[in-house]
Amino acid sequence: MTFTRISHFSLFFSSFFFLSSTLSSHLYPASATTPEKDGKTRSLYSEILRDEAVARLNDLGKVSDADGYLERTFMSPASVRAGFLIREWMEDAGLRTWVDSMGNLHGRVEGMNASAQALLIGSHLDTVVDAGMFDGSLGIISAISALKVLKSIGKLGELKRPVEVIAFSDEEGVRFQSTFLGSAAVAGILPVTALKISDKSGVTVQDALKGNSIEITEDSLLGLKYDPASIWGYFELHIEQGPVLEWVGFPLAVVKGIAGQTRMKVTVRGSQGHAGTVPMSMRRDPMAAAAELIVLLESLCKHPRDFLSSGGNCNEQTLESLSTSLVCTVGEISTWPSASNVIPGQVTFTVDLRAIDDVGREAVVYELSNQMYKICDRRSVSCIIERKVGRFPKHFAKHFA
């Protein structure tokens, strides 16, 4: 479901109600009164889970490093201001708060059994450039609001396990071109070399944290890893960021997994020349070649069966999965020297390719690369394809579904 207007109260409210009900049904001891039966709680639903939550999402949507659109990157001034706001709201909900050495903001309530496995709920507070206000923020605010309802009716201390809300410092990877810095640190899969990654200004991840009075070392980074045995599960409420649920009229859906992702950088080099003097028959134009490569990508991703055979690694199940889940995007393209009267000497563009089937995704990358090289050879231009990011798909726990 894509929320295009804040006035979509019925759909919006159902998301918060779902999370509140999830907390109630899964975490209260059997002898406790569930909040749904409490008249006071029902009135609080509209006050806290709708009105206040909407106001907070609007407030958070105004915290930006840019004028006229929403942008918050890792450890930017707006990101820090957003963290202050969220921390204030966490404490208002009765949570104990702290910031870890990767800049993640945590809010926790221990409940009746502090040694029990904890339920983690959260999302990310950073954004892409020109972001929507609900991406990431919805998952954080909904969790805080649901817990505030429990506090308001005196039930927060009756949770049978700890509940921890996490506002991750980085998911999008806009500033350092390295995604999931915040959650990867908590999961224990972020390499210590990530601290030395630099942004376009030469500032490293470690420098950015230090600039905000957060000291991090290789040892403290490794110490951020949560013991899997201490975690009961992780839950995140998130907007769909697509048109499907809204199109079919469903307010909510349970996600079964996250697609694997491959990001590539493609560099095409040809022969730079004057736009008015080089005959078409003598051109080695990397822009024209790049255009053909991009159209190839679109065709392959729309019709994978036309490019991949059912033999080898791609069985019928894989092809069927690709037909429904494969998506491909060219989001950035640049030319050199980038002048209207100059045939470019070089064109660079990115490829973002995602699919839930890992074998199928690799088959697509392999076939795409082969076809791209053939096109470049035919056009007498050189082509370099670099794999920048690779993420395996994640299939979610069935008992949550």
Give the ranges of each region predicted by the language model.
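Histidine/acidic-residue-rich, glycine-tolerant segments that coordinate divalent metal ions
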Residues: 169-281
